[in-house]
From Swiss-Prot:
The lineage of its organism: Eukaryota, Fungi, Dikarya, Ascomycota, Pezizomycotina. It comes from Cochliobolus lunatus (Filamentous fungus). Its EC number is 1.-.-.-. Belongs to the clz3 oxygenase family. Keywords: Copper, Glycoprotein, Membrane, Oxidoreductase, Transmembrane, Transmembrane helix. The gene is clz3. The keyword Cell inner membrane does not apply. It is a single-pass membrane protein. The chain crosses the membrane at residues 257-277. Pathway: Secondary metabolite biosynthesis. Glycans are attached at residues 9, 249. This is Probable copper-dependent oxygenase clz3. GO terms for cellular component: membrane. Probable copper-dependent oxygenase; part of the gene cluster that mediates the biosynthesis of squalestatin S1 (SQS1, also known as zaragozic acid A), a heavily oxidized fungal polyketide that offers potent cholesterol lowering activity by targeting squalene synthase (SS). SQS1 is composed of a 2,8-dioxobicyclic[3.2.1]octane-3,4,5-tricarboxyclic acid core that is connected to two lipophilic polyketide arms. It is found in: Membrane. Its main location: membrane.
Amino acid sequence: MSANLEYPNGTTADAENGMWLHHILFYNKANRDDICGEKKPGQRFFGSGNDRTPLDLTDGGKNKLGYHIGHNDQFFISVELMNMHFSSQVVVLTAHWKFVEEPYSKYELGTPYWFDVASCGRSDVPATNNAIFDFISPPVRLDFHGRMAYLSNHVHDGAFLHEVKKNGKTICSVNPQYSSADGADGIVHLSHVPPCSNAGPVAPGDEVSLTASYDTTKYKPMINEDGTLEPVMGVTLAYIVKGTAPVENDSGGRLYFAVPLAAIAFIALIISGGYVIYSAKQQKAWPKWLSRRQKYQSVGTEVESFITR
């Protein structure tokens, strides 16, 4: 999935020529947002900014991962565009999709989770000029087993580091990339925010948070028409494949099973050995007892034959 802003002739309209795709966000009205619930109008499953970084769930064809679109699903978008020119501009907002028709049994189902430094409010947070600062999201506690399959990250101009953490340990760390040429406003702008893929398993009780780090002494933030600073963002759209609890390693399982079996076998061996020793002693004592009894009471021929052994 990708979004773009173009001129009618098909050329890209971006910060270098004074047109900004500030942000675009796709909602699926048929599904409930898994983090914010009814606070959001639907499930957020795709977003993009002026960097136009695509959402490639397959990671270049390495993974069979997708987002399910039902027959009755309804999409709507939230979009903000900016024109840095003093005259009106005609532009076209485009969205490109790659999809697989049913059946798609070879693909895993990814569920989108929107982690945001602003939690469930507006994603905008205030910027500071000529400063180094961080925004840290409230931790989100998960209640299921699964796998962090793909993480799409979004920040604004001024960001130099974006990290996603699970239980305090970093599972995704990216450095936003900037264009080599100045934009129409004379400053460099974001050109790409790298994603992360296969960021590891998750389990009930795991807490996920993110940190968006900004350095506006090095990278100039965006400025509004009135000269004030444009708010910044820190977002990770994580596609999680839900599943069952991981199975213990087979070799370890067999070892745990083999130990009690070996103990049982060892005990049985001791018992059988003791029985053999006891039987041998009993076999030697039995004839003596019979011979003494023979003195006052006769015994059968089978017993007599046993005595003579």
